[in-house]
Amino acid sequence: MQNITQSWFVQGMIKATTDAWLKGWDERNGGNLTLRLDDADIAPYKDNFHAQPRYIPLSQPMPLLANTPFIVTGSGKFFRNVQLDPAANLGVVKVDSDGAGYHILWGLTNEAVPTSELPAHFLSHCERIKATNGKDRVIMHCHATNLIALTYVLENDTAVFTRQLWEGSTECLVVFPDGVGILPWMVPGTDEIGQATAQEMQKHSLVLWPFHGVFGSGSTLDETFGLIDTAEKSAQVLVKVYSMGGMKQTISREELIALGKRFGVTPLASALAL
């Protein structure tokens, strides 16, 4: 019998959650991570599944995700502990045939349930499936320190925030030319913040929750982690720059345009226009 804890997707979740913990992005039970799978990914591990999978209804049906398996982090679980006990802190779930709920096939032992932000994740998965023709498979939420810090001092506007991050590090425009969506402050763990996040995910692979954290989307765990890491590195540079009295010189609009042309990306027009 193959052990599911040795599968690429469990091992990938262990690495991503451990790396995020070591970065300082996921204190206590902060942060959550979901990865969309295919039936072929989980088929070799059916002998590991619960004999009687628990069923949990969704707060709203999501027919686009019908019959789709995911691996998810658990509610109240600490990222630092995933590596110690994957079955207690992660779960493989599968949405039912009408998208009204899901079964917990593996993991989330001792009656644990998926992250409280699952509505935000699933709604964002729906939008990124449509926006990327199914390429994006990962939604990651974390409390990236410097990005959060900037939401207290920068105007919480997509164009303004995006332009500052592009100027903070040359690679940013190449990595997220679509910019950073920003919400108003909202209560987490609700359908409302999930819907607002998903709406921004139609246009952006990064969405900031002011005074709270960031959501990122990508095709793989590495791509998604790298996306957030790149934005966070720029935010760290900006925090240092602002603390030293602000910018005396920076990347110009003309240079940003040249950068986009060189790497074949189309920068967010509203950010470029500032």
From Swiss-Prot:
It is found in: Cytoplasm. Its EC number is 4.1.2.19. Zn(2+) binds at H141, H143, H212. Belongs to the aldolase class II family. RhaD subfamily. The keyword Transmembrane helix does not apply. It comes from Escherichia coli O139:H28 (strain E24377A / ETEC). Keywords: Cytoplasm, Lyase, Metal-binding, Rhamnose metabolism, Zinc. This is Rhamnulose-1-phosphate aldolase. SUPFAM superfamilies: AraD/HMP-PK domain-like.
